């Protein structure tokens, strides 16, 4: 499972969530803590670069948010990010520098590293996407098993029980879907 460890999947210099990710070995271990991390980090963001736009919603002044986009907190939209028409951020979302969240894309409990693109008709839930990861049109990170049992991550070497009912995907840096 060495390949699935945070240190091997993600360049932590490319996410504002590095202090959270550094505390854990595997990406799924981070998911239950995204919400509280955002709240703590948001209150510490520099006011000259970020503005608070509602309860637990911080948006970089250099970011672009379409008037038809819906942002629910807690969330952080980092610098130069673009939130396009009808994007829906349900909460517990970190949107990295230069990231694109497009038309009819929904986010829930996610970390999008810098320059991630989820540009149209995507669902990204309970997931972590690495630097420059890109999800093509209509791709989703299904986050609940059809039998509603806990998610097990499997490899040739071993199986690891995550203890989670909801776990979408862990896309490493520069992954294309």
Predicted feature residues:
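Terminal amphipathic alpha-helical/low-complexity segments used for targeting or macromolecular assembly
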Residues: 1-56, 61
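Flexible, glycine/small-residue-enriched loop-and-beta-strand segment within the central core
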Residues: 42, 69-78, 82-174
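LRR N-terminal entry segment and analogous cap-like coil->beta motifs
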Residues: 64-68
């Amino acid at each position: 499972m060495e390949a699935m460890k945070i240190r091997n999947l993600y360049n932590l210099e490319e996410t504002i969530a590095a202090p959270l990710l550094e505390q854990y070995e595997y990406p799924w271990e981070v998911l239950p803590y995204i919400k509280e991390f955002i709240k703590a980090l948001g209150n510490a963001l520099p006011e000259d670069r970020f503005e608070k736009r509602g309860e637990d919603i911080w948006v970089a002044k250099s970011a672009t948010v379409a008037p038809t986009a819906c942002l629910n907190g807690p969330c952080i939209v980092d610098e130069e990010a673009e939130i396009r028409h009808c994007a829906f951020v349900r909460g517990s979302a970190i949107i990295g520098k230069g990231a694109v969240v497009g038309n009819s894309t929904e986010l829930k409990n996610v970390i999008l590293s810098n320059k991630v693109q989820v540009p149209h008709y995507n669902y990204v839930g309970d997931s972590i996407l690495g630097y420059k990861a890109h999800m093509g049109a209509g791709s989703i990170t299904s986050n609940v098993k059809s039998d509603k049992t806990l998610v097990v991550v499997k490899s040739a070497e071993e199986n690891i029980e995550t203890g989670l009912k909801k776990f979408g995907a862990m896309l490493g840096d520069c992954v294309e879907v």
